Amino acid sequence: MGRHSKPDPEDSVDDLSDGHAAEQQHWEDISGSYDYPGVDQPDDGPLSSEGHYSAVGGYSASGSEDYPDIPPRPDWEPTGAEPIAAAPPPLFRFGHRGPGDWQAGHRSADGRRGVSIGVIVALVAVVVMVAGVILWRFFGDALSNRSHTAAARCVGGKDTVAVIADPSIADQVKESADSYNASAGPVGDRCVAVAVTSAGSDAVINGFIGKWPTELGGQPGLWIPSSSISAARLTGAAGSQAISDSRSLVISPVLLAVRPELQQALANQNWAALPGLQTNPNSLSGLDLPAWGSLRLAMPSSGNGDAAYLAGEAVAAASAPAGAPATAGIGAVRTLMGARPKLADDSLTAAMDTLLKPGDVATAPVHAVVTTEQQLFQRGQSLSDAENTLGSWLPPGPAAVADYPTVLLSGAWLSQEQTSAASAFARYLHKPEQLAKLARAGFRVSDVKPPSSPVTSFPALPSTLSVGDDSMRATLADTMVTASAGVAATIMLDQSMPNDEGGNSRLSNVVAALENRIKAMPPSSVVGLWTFDGREGRTEVPAGPLADPVNGQPRPAALTAALGKQYSSGGGAVSFTTLRLIYQEMLANYRVGQANSVLVITAGPHTDQTLDGPGLQDFIRKSADPAKPIAVNIIDFGADPDRATWEAVAQLSGGSYQNLETSASPDLATAVNIFLS
């Protein structure tokens, strides 16, 4: 039968059903033959203006070209002999069919075929869905393109984030900053460049404590000091909130740059030996270097990173008694710092120039310089005969290491874009290609072969030195800062030491050690002398700077004369009451900017019953002023029954206690040198 003719009598119901099914399949074929975006496509995930697309301009000029056109519904004309009515009947009929309608309920009298409402609803839903997806993606792409384009054009403006690097690594950081600025994309809608300034850690820390110095530029978002000591000092000065992240970039061990003649002589020494070698007038004679006198070790702070601070940590840790914290070795650090050579300035350049100056090596003003392996490498590269003029000594034991952390800072002076740019640059510095550049400059980088050098073989390192938490590291560093101004010490000497030791009385041996130390102390040091016996304590020379005369006589000479007239007595000691008098006097005349201390040298026992051990401890506990710290250091001989009291007093005051069996040993000179530093 024709497509739109009435059913013939022989047509069955099944035939009619088959025809309707075929027509419905025809529509499904049409709608399914086009790939509509968003219908059967995999989910692309949420649209984003950042990070989802690789670059601006990755699209065609018109976003609609990314999607196929939706074809119009195909036209079809009824076939057959029946004419089309002028006004077609409604597409949908409702209610009951009359007897003239389709037989078997499939055809109406007018010959028009009805379409299932479910098919129409589904088709409309698909069209609406496709249109919605197209519009959604079109506007999303447009906004994304607009955001990327705006960012690429820096519509929010241009900005700079400051980076401060230690002078020892600043040149390499500036080189990395240039390549970073050439390739970095915008942060949000702003272009943020990195600007690197070279500055030492003291300048940066002082800037955070007080007014930020204009010569350093803007306050930084990233700081690269020589070591984590500087980060610890900043935390102590400005609070932990000042640092948001800190991690090591490269490392370089601290060592001594020396003349080759001294290198082999130091082979069996260690960090703890340096204070004694520095202060003993003939120390190097014992190392088969006659006519060299004492070691003249320079410890420059300018242009030398944190090498001096790191060496101080190593000396303190090695000098502290077994089981004691590194702070117990602070005296040794002060000794080393106090006896360093006096140069034109405190720079690494001045120290190295003096070390390498032609002439008699034995009598040279400088025998060795504390620095880092990287600085040694750089100096060696500039010498024509480096192998014969410059050597190095890396002390045995745990290595003091400059770890050059990338310290991300946090503060109100930074915008979000500056903070993000500083973080991005820090990550950039940690990339392998940037680390390789640093390795070529002499820094140690994990799994990167170091360059060849005539002055160092870049030997394998033992374990890294650890001296405690940030607070302890800051304390040790601050001690070295104050040590440069010398000490303010009062010597409290016990006259009742008649024991014969090494052919001299114990008192004579002590006097000799004190005289040698006073001769080596810097003129800025403040020194006074008290003595005591079984009856009383008395002032021999009032405390004052060594540069100031006493009764028309140079103070060192006055002190030496007073010591020379001492004689041994055998009757008791009023040590506790004498210390009380001295402590009160030092509180009243506290020397700001210097390490104030009392050095008690005694053998006991205390015999004055007006003040016992617990009473002395209670006095120290109540009198101590945190704003005026006064350390009580004790050198105690033999089996002194007052030992427990002296140990407690030293601990309460922040000082140290050392017991010696005899005065006839180098340990006495070492102890005196440590405590008067």
Curated annotation (Swiss-Prot):
SUPFAM superfamilies: vWA-like. The keyword Transcription does not apply. Residues 51-64 have a biased composition (Low complexity). The keyword Acetylation does not apply. GO terms for cellular component: extracellular region; peptidoglycan-based cell wall; plasma membrane. Residues 17-29 have a biased composition (Basic and acidic residues). Pfam families: SBP_bac_11 (PF13531). It is a multi-pass membrane protein. It is found in: Cell membrane. It comes from the Bacteria. Residues 1-87 are annotated as: Disordered. Coiled coil: none annotated. InterPro entries: VWF_A, vWFA_dom_sf. Keywords: Cell membrane, Membrane, Transmembrane, Transmembrane helix. Was identified as a high-confidence drug target. This is Uncharacterized protein Rv1836c. It comes from Mycobacterium tuberculosis (strain ATCC 25618 / H37Rv).
